[in-house]
Structures are given as structure tokens and as C-alpha cells.
């Protein structure tokens, strides 16, 4: 960087430095013209640029300049395609350059704790590994164009209900393994210019003033060297926030918090060094944006629309396909049923709402793809304005379906059902849509349901339809992408990035979402999504990682290059995948790891690798994965680090979390010995489970139990069970004078210091 930032900071007044730490207006940073510090613009959003027009009111979020509306993250994640996500990110970066936007507010890497979260359509997955990998690709793509990405919302912002005030209570291990992990790899791997803190409190402190979150973890551990920005209006106490690591407040405070910062520095409440560090981080990004600015930048709208079409097609998930009803034949009569045909839901509502450069017409795209030999019949079926059942529309739909070879029913969630700002209260689609599907099933056996929704829904009619294609919110090229997949021009290759439960009550957060008053406790802990369903043995409607194809794939020959390794070693895993069908296609190979026996609670299995591979009919390829320590580790709160327990681990290769086709066993040996610290209140059983400690306590315990004639080897002896469960201090009373309190203290000290 040609600019000497430290020199500039020395030339800045205290007031200028404080002023740089809050916005100029809703979207810009403050300039300092006398020192050559420009103002830069940041704006939404994750799946398309939402730059509000200059004449638009702040609340008029739908009045923005035209931009390409790509599939939302919920859909794009189902592509499991790092390269595709990076290409979408690069396209977003190009559009930012064309509109003089320096920072794009996205991607969102929040975990899908509950299917009810109203903003889930903006997030990638329930799994932190998948989420962080795709977020990293998105960031790399955006920043490849000289535009900064803003990773958000850090952290534990997993609901819209009271999101600005709710206190999210999460234990440390769950934070590390689930909610932090979704951000960690993205920060370390892709180095986003900006990270946005969330609105909520985390374990009692607002994220905007949480030092542990913003400084200790994000900046010191993960080495984030950009700046931290508040979510819009998330600042509670500006001085405390700055001290904790919140560099930039957005939007403008109209000078109010600038004065508070100045007063805090003058009074000694806030160190000027902390202010200087925040200014340095902000200036670094501002000048990076300035250096990378492309004058008179333009982008190819048609090329971006084609990319949006490809991204949507590659993200669609074929959930069910009995009798190979899909792909559709390019002949005969096809009934297209549902108001979504004419007025599709292709994006979510809220701050990510895009004004598209163009919008495909689903009916026209299917008509064009089908050709002259296809006769299309359209029937509205239901009204989008309300959920009321219109029998006249249903009868018209039945008539259209009965006279057709196949009926394609478009269903899903209207805008009013899911949006930023509020959560759903159920997983149902509108009752008029459910009734329509049931009615069509009475007269037509070949039914395809196309779902347009941002998160999982219940499907009470699932056994009455032959095919279900999950299209999520597919962006402006949804129509063309649907035509490609329905007619087989594109072989569906998407797989679910989240579990579809049979019903809401099966979800692990069911009893604790959205919490009570201003507090929500994550009592399910680590067991989010498939980690819960698979461990609990609950059969989902469609499991995590599930997705069908128009072709068939076979797996064989799993191998590992090492079977017995230390935890700091690298293990390479390879597996062969062959296309044994008649159509070219892509398969997503998933690798899970299972700890066979652990002293701590762990999920049944966890995703630790995935690769998407293209195969022509008859073609076979070898897919290779590399596993390091983190693939086998859990977060140990005693040592405040990732730890692997010595033992056997299973490496599982699957088509989904529930369809495991190959497995191999490896032994991983820990290089870190963790010694528990015992006290007089430690249970006898816990001490005896440690071999070194047992060698010290064992003889003393045997002397006491022999005198009491207690058989400690008899698992059904009540007194033996009591002895095992009692604290060491209770042995004094049972010892009949053999063990004093002073002797016990010496014994505990010896136990803790034994080699």
C-alpha cells in the first residue's frame, strides 16, 4: 500500500479520528478531505447489489438500481460448489465496481438453528463446515474484483424475533464448534475486508461491545486485519464498543457518538491508542478500495443473467422422482398449475431485496424449452393475496390436470410467510396450496411439485405426488433454470444444505425457539440439524445432503494413506465414483467423521469434507480428501483449544448424512495429554477413571471398602454404586479413622501431581 497510514493518523485531530469511526450517512464513511481520505460506499446485499437510488427514502428498500438477482444463499448452498459460488461472488464484485460500491454487505454465515428463522434464505447451512467453505468462496469472489466483502452477522444471530435486544445464551463448546466455526474458516481462508457484528447480546453482552467476540477471538485468534462494522443501529454504548473492538458504527450518529468518543479520550476513560488502532483498520480498507477502484467499470448484464441461470439450475434439489417422471418429455400435454407460475417468488424480502435487471417468465421459458410438440395448459389454482381456498380455481386446476399427461404444481411460501424482521411460527405452506395438490392428486397420478421457498416446509401430500423439485428462491433466471432442469437440459445435482424434518416438533430447538422475553437459551447445544436427527435416530422427511439425479452413481474403493497417526498428521482419503447411468451428471461426494468412543458428548457424525465431481456416462474418477487435526477434534473448554482424544475414528463416505455407502477406520493418537484437576469434591468414579490418579487412590480406596466389606467390582451392589458417586471428602467419614481430612488433602495433592 503506497499510503503511509500511520503518518496520516498522526496528522489527524482527535475529532477527525472520532468522526471516522461513524458513518457520514446511511451508506458512506466520512471523508477527511484535507488529508486525502475519501468517503467510500457500502451497501447490501448477499445475492445481488441493493444500491438504493439517490432519490429513495431510507425506508424505501425496494427502490434500488437494477442489478442481477442471483439465487439466495439457501439455494446456492445446495450446489455445494465452491467454484460456482466464487464465480457468483466475482460477478457481484463486478457490479459493485460499476456502481462505485466499495464494500458489499455479505455473505451471511449464520447457522440455521431452526427452520423458522425468517432470514434463513440469506444463510447457507445448518452445518458450520459447509457454511464456512461457501462463505469463503463467496468472499474470495467478491474481493477478486477489488471490492471488500463484509461477513455477517457475528455471532449467534439465528432468529429475527427481538433480534436487536435478545440475549443469546450459548455454552462455550457449542459456540466454538457450531456458531463460531461457521465464521472461523471464512475469516482465516478468505480474509474478508470487513466483519459485521450482530444486533443481539451474546451471553449477557451486546455483540457490539463484546471484547471476547470482537477482539480476543476475531482479531487476536483468527487474525482478522480488516475492520469491524456494526449492524445498522446495533450500537448500545459507543465508547464501550470501541474499546471492545467495534471499529465503525453505521449508519451515522449525526455526531452524537463522535463527541462521546472525544470526551472519553480526554477524560482517560478510553485510550487514544485504541482509537488509533480502529482508525488504522478503517483507513486500511478505505485505501485498499481506492487503490482497487476501476474507473468507468461496466458489466455484461447478459453474461451475469446466464450465470444466474446456471447457478439456479445447479442449486435445485430433486427430492423425489418416482417412475422417473422427470425429466419431462418434449411431447404431449403439460399442465402448469399455481399462481407462482405467473408471479414467482424468486427472492426474499428485507434488506437483500433486489431490483432485477430482467426477470424470466416461467411459463414462456418452459414453453420455449418444450418446443412445438408440447402443449402447455395453465391454471391459477390458488390466490397469492390470501390463504383462502377457492373451489372454483381448484376445479379449474383439476380439469387442466385430468386432461394432461403430467401436472406440474408450483407451490411454496409467499412473501408474507418469511422475511427479514420476523420468524415463521409454523412450517406449513398456505392451506390453499396444500388443498390444491391433494385435489390434483385425485385426477392425475403424474404430479411434479416445484417448491419456491426460502426454508424447509412440511409436505403432508408427499405420498401422493411422484416428484418434488426444490428450487428455493432461484433469482431472476429462475424460469430458465427450471425449464433446463424439468426437461433434462441440466441434470439436477443439488443436495440439501439443511434437513427437512417431517414436522416442526422434531426440530432440536423446538422447545427453545424463539425464547422468552429477551432471552433465548440454546439448550440443544451441539446438536443442531442433522447432528441431532442422526444422533437421536429421528427419521427426517429429507436428510441433510440428500438430492437425486437423472443418472446413477456408484462408489467404490475407499482408501486412506495412513491407518494409525498422531493428531498433528495429515490423512489423505480417496474414493472412486462412477456414473453408471445414461446421462452426464454431477455428484456431491460427502465425507463424515465419527468418533467411535468419546469421553465427551459428540454427534453421531460430522461433515468434514465434500467435493462435486462431473462424470460422463460410464466415466469413473477418484476423489481425494485431506483431513487434518480439526477433522477429528472437539473443542476442549479446559485447555481452551481443539483436542483429539486418542482412539478409533470412522471415515464415512455418503450420498447424504443418512445414506452412507463406504467406511474406513483409522486410529488417531493425541499428542496432548490432558490431566484433570481433582479436588476433595471430585467424584470417586471420576478419579478412578484416570489411570494415573487411580494408581494413587486405588490402594486407599481398597483398604476402606475391604474394611466395609463392599465389593467394588459388583456393578449391582448399592453400596459400591454409592461409593463411586460420592465426593472424595465423604471417604473420610466412611474410613473408620483410616483417612483424616489432612491426609485427604495430601492425597489429592499427590493425585494432581502424579506423572
From Swiss-Prot:
UniProt keyword Hydrolase present: yes
Biological pathway: Glycan metabolism; cellulose degradation
Active-site positions on this chain: 231
Domain of life: Bacteria
Keyword Kinase: no
Keywords on record: Carbohydrate metabolism, Cellulose degradation, Glycosidase, Hydrolase, Polysaccharide degradation
GO molecular function (one): beta-glucosidase activity
Enzymatic reactions: Hydrolysis of terminal, non-reducing beta-D-glucosyl residues with release of beta-D-glucose
A matching Pfam family: Fn3-like
UniProt cross-references to SMART domains, sorted A to Z: Fn3_like
InterPro entries noted in UniProt: Cellulose_deg_GH3, Fn3-like, Glyco_hydro_3_AS, Glyco_hydro_3_C, Glyco_hydro_3_C_sf, Glyco_hydro_3_N, Glyco_hydro_3_N_sf, Glycoside_hydrolase_SF
Enzyme nomenclature, EC number: 3.2.1.21
GO BP annotations listed: cellulose catabolic process
SUPFAM superfamilies registered for this protein in UniProt: (Trans)glycosidases, Beta-D-glucan exohydrolase, C-terminal domain
Enzyme class: hydrolase
Entry's family note: Belongs to the glycosyl hydrolase 3 family.
PANTHER family to which the protein is assigned, alphabetical: BETA-GLUCOSIDASE (PTHR42715:SF10)
Name the UniProt record assigns to this protein: Thermostable beta-glucosidase B
Organism per entry: Acetivibrio thermocellus (strain ATCC 27405 / DSM 1237 / JCM 9322 / NBRC 103400 / NCIMB 10682 / NRRL B-4536 / VPI 7372) (Clostridium thermocellum)
Amino acid at each position: 500500500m503506497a499510503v503511509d497510514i500511520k503518518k496520516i493518523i498522526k496528522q489527524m485531530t482527535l475529532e477527525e479520528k472520532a468522526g471516522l469511526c461513524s458513518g457520514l450517512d446511511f451508506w458512506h464513511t466520512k471523508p477527511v478531505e484535507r488529508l486525502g481520505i475519501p468517503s467510500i460506499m457500502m451497501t447490501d446485499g448477499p445475492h445481488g447489489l441493493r444500491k438504493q437510488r439517490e432519490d429513495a427514502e431510507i425506508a424505501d428498500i425496494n427502490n434500488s438500481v437494477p442489478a442481477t438477482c442471483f439465487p439466495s444463499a439457501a439455494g446456492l448452498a445446495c450446489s455445494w460448489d465452491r467454484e460456482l459460488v466464487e464465480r457468483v461472488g466475482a460477478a457481484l464484485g463486478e457490479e459493485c465496481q460499476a456502481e462505485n460500491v466499495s464494500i458489499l454487505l455479505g455473505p451471511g454465515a449464520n447457522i440455521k438453528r431452526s427452520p423458522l428463522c425468517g432470514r434463513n434464505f440469506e444463510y447457507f447451512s445448518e452445518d458450520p463446515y459447509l457454511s464456512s467453505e461457501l462463505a469463503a468462496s463467496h468472499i474470495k469472489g467478491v474481493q477478486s474484483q477489488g471490492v471488500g466483502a463484509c461477513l455477517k452477522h457475528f455471532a449467534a444471530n439465528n432468529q429475527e424475533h427481538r433480534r436487536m435486544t435478545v440475549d443469546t445464551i450459548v455454552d462455550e463448546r457449542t459456540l466454538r464448534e457450531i456458531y463460531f466455526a461457521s465464521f472461523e474458516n471464512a475469516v482465516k481462508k478468505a480474509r474478508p475486508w470487513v466483519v459485521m457484528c450482530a444486533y443481539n447480546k451474546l451471553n449477557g453482552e451486546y455483540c457490539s461491545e463484546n471484547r471476547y467476540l470482537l477482539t480476543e477471538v476475531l482479531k487476536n485468534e483468527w487474525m482478522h486485519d480488516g475492520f469491524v462494522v456494526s449492524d445498522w443501529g446495533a450500537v448500545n454504548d459507543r465508547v464501550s464498543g470501541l474499546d471492545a473492538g467495534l471499529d465503525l458504527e453505521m449508519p451515522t450518529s449525526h455526531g452524537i457518538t463522535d463527541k462521546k468518543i472525544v470526551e472519553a479520550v480526554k477524560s482517560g476513560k478510553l485510550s487514544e491508542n485504541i482509537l488509533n488502532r480502529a482508525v488504522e483498520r478503517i483507513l486500511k480498507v478505505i485505501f485498499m478500495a481506492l487503490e482497487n477502484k476501476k474507473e468507468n467499470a461496466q458489466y455484461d448484464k447478459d453474461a451475469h443473467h446466464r450465470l444466474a441461470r446456471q447457478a439456479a439450475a445447479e442449486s435445485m434439489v430433486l427430492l423425489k422422482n418416482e417412475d422417473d417422471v422427470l425429466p419431462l418429455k418434449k411431447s404431449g400435454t403439460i399442465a402448469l398449475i399455481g399462481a407462482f407460475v405467473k408471479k414467482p417468488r424468486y427472492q426474499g424480502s428485507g434488506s437483500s431485496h433486489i431490483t432485477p435487471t430482467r426477470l424470466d417468465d416461467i411459463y414462456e421459458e418452459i414453453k420455449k424449452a418444450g418446443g412445438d410438440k408440447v402443449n402447455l395448459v395453465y391454471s391459477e389454482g390458488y390466490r397469492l393475496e390470501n390463504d383462502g381456498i377457492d373451489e372454483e380455481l381448484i376445479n379449474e386446476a383439476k380439469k387442466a390436470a385430468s386432461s394432461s399427461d403430467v401436472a406440474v404444481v408450483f407451490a411454496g411460501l409467499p412473501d408474507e410467510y418469511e422475511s427479514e424482521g420476523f420468524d415463521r411460527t409454523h412450517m406449513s405452506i398456505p392451506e390453499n396450496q396444500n388443498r390444491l395438490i391433494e385435489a390434483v392428486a385425485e385426477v392425475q397420478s403424474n404430479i411434479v411439485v416445484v417448491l419456491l421457498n426460502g426454508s424447509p416446509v412440511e409436505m403432508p401430500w408427499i405420498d401422493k405426488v411422484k416428484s418434488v423439485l426444490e428450487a428455493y428462491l432461484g433469482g431472476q433466471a429462475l424460469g430458465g433454470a427450471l425449464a433446463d432442469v424439468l426437461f433434462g437440459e441440466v441434470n439436477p445435482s443439488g443436495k440439501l444444505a439443511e434437513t427437512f424434518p417431517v414436522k416442526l416438533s422434531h426440530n432440536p430447538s423446538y422447545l427453545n425457539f424463539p425464547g422468552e422475553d429477551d432471552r433465548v437459551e440454546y439448550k440443544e447445544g451441539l446438536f443442531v440439524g442433522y447432528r441431532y436427527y442422526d444422533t437421536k435416530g429421528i427419521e427426517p422427511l429429507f436428510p441433510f445432503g440428500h438430492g437425486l439425479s437423472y443418472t446413477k452413481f456408484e462408489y467404490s474403493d475407499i482408501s486412506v494413506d495412513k491407518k494409525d497417526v498422531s493428531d498433528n498428521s495429515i490423512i489423505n482419503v480417496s474414493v472412486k465414483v462412477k456414473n453408471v447411468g445414461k446421462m452426464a451428471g454431477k455428484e456431491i461426494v460427502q465425507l463424515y467423521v465419527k468418533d467411535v468412543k468419546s469421553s465427551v458428548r459428540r454427534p453421531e457424525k460430522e461433515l468434514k469434507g465434500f467435493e462435486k465431481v462431473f462424470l460422463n456416462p460410464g466415466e469413473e474418477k477418484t476423489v481425494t480428501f485431506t483431513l487434518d487435526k480439526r477433522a477429528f477434534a472437539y473443542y476442549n473448554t479446559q485447555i481452551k483449544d481443539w483436542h483429539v482424544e486418542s482412539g478409533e475414528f470412522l471415515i464415512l463416505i455418503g450420498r447424504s448424512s443418512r445414506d452412507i455407502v463406504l467406511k474406513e477406520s483409522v486410529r488417531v493418537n493425541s499428542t496432548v495429554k490432558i490431566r484433570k484437576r481433582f479436588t476433595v469434591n471430585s467424584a470417586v468414579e471420576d478419579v478412578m477413571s484416570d489411570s494415573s490418579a487411580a494408581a494413587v487412590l486405588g490402594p486407599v480406596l481398597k483398604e476402606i471398602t475391604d474394611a466395609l466389606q463392599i465389593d467394588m467390582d459388583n456393578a449391582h451392589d448399592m453400596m459400591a454404586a454409592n461409593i463411586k458417586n460420592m465426593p472424595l471428602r465423604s471417604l473420610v467419614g466412611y474410613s473408620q479413622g483410616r483417612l483424616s481430612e489432612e491426609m485427604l488433602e495430601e492425597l489429592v495433592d499427590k493425585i494432581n501431581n502424579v506423572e
